[in-house]
Swiss-Prot record:
Residues 5-14 form a propeptide. Belongs to the AB hydrolase superfamily. Lipase family. GO terms for cellular component: extracellular space. It is found in: Secreted. Disulfide bonds join C20-C103, C192-C197, C235-C240, C257-C284, C258-C309, C277-C282. This is Phospholipase A1 4. Its EC number is 3.1.1.32. Catalyzes the hydrolysis of phosphatidylcholine with phospholipase A1 activity. May act as an allergen and induce hemolytic activity. Pfam families: Lipase. Residues 1-4 form the signal peptide. The lineage of its organism: Eukaryota, Metazoa, Ecdysozoa, Arthropoda, Hexapoda. The active site is at S153 (nucleophile), D181 (charge relay system), H242 (charge relay system). One of its GO terms (biological process) is lipid catabolic process. The keyword Lipid metabolism applies.
């Protein structure tokens, strides 16, 4: 998972600035389906030249995953999410691996001097994802209503840039963007054109889990503040809380429980009790959030261990 902790704490390694230069040719696509559970690696150029996707695959819902700083497209948490999407909902999952642009080669040194480069690269990766989406729509006849993006940290903002670009390309809007603890550093005062924003898809869902490494303002149609969005149970490091957003969504995809969000106006107000929840006032985190009418900010109580349920057995 990506780790912005040393950046936020100001404990930068004063070594040589890493080279995290973006090059589209470095991007790989990890493609998962029920008959390719461990994933295959493709390049966009190959997709242009060969009819690789079978009609039976491409007709499914498609989830495009985008990782964050210092991470990879097949990181452990994304791999678990991809397998859950395949198993439960028979998705076609495409994980965008932009590890070089995300400075993954320097992850072992914990050198975050390349963070500003990675931030700049998010726009390039967003354009890449939009161009890939155009290929899916025009060559493979995939409707935009079948495509959702799921991005963690810098990947959340990258998803936003992709959402803006597909609209510029006149493709319409993605069905949904799910922003998993959208990155805070370099985005703390950003306006909509420069970050993930609720207009970037038909529905934008944000799951906030770290006030240190993530943004603490609303960016979506619904914004879930898990455990008040500050830090997470069982986590002593901000990076642990930051990564929990990915794990929470994966458990919600498995549908072992519903993480319920109850309306919450601000950090200084007391959220309503889960026991008072009705389907028209509260929202379940996850792939079905869009089916609930309520929008805005929601407080989500969680337990320390998976599947993290703290919903008093309530069914919405």
């Amino acid at each position: 998972a990506d780790d912005l902790t040393t950046l936020r704490n100001g404990t930068l390694d004063r070594g040589i600035t890493p080279d995290c230069t973006f090059n589209e040719k470095d991007i790989e696509l990890h493609v998962y389906s029920r008959d390719k559970r461990n994933g295959i690696i493709l390049k966009k150029e190959i997709l242009k030249n060969y009819d690789l996707f079978q009609k039976s695959q491409i007709s499914h819902q498609i989830a495009i995953l985008i990782h964050g700083f210092l991470s990879t497209g097949n990181n452990e948490n994304f791999d678990a999410m991809a397998k859950a999407l395949i198993e439960i909902d028979n998705f076609l999952v495409i994980s965008v691996d932009w590890k070089k642009g995300a400075c993954n080669a320097f992850a072992s040194t914990n050198d975050v001097l390349g963070y500003s480069q990675a931030v700049g690269n998010t726009r390039h990766v967003g354009k890449y994802v939009a161009d890939f989406t155009k290929l899916l729509v025009e060559q493979y006849k995939v409707p935009m209503s079948n495509i959702r993006l799921i991005g963690h940290s810098l990947g959340a903002h990258t998803s936003g840039f992709a959402g803006k670009e597909v609209q510029r390309l006149k493709l319409g809007k993605y069905k949904e963007i799910i922003g998993l603890d959208p990155a805070g550093p370099s985005f703390l005062t950003s306006k909509c054109p420069d970050r993930l924003c609720e207009t970037d898809a038909e529905y934008v869902q944000a799951i906030h889990t770290s006030a240190i490494l993530g943004v603490y303002y609303n960016v979506g149609s619904v914004d879930f503040y898990v455990n008040y969005g500050k830090s997470q149970p069982g986590c002593s490091e901000p990076s642990c809380s930051h990564t929990k957003a990915v794990k929470y969504l994966t458990e919600c995809i498995k549908r072992e429980c519903c993480l319920i969000g109850t309306p919450w106006k601000s950090y200084f107000s007391t959220p309503k009790s889960i026991s008072q929840c009705k389907r028209d006032t509260c929202v379940c985190v996850g792939l079905n959030a869009q089916s609930y009418p309520a929008k805005g900010s929601f407080y989500v109580p969680v337990e320390k261990d998976a599947p993290y349920c703290h919903n008093e057995g309530i069914k919405l």
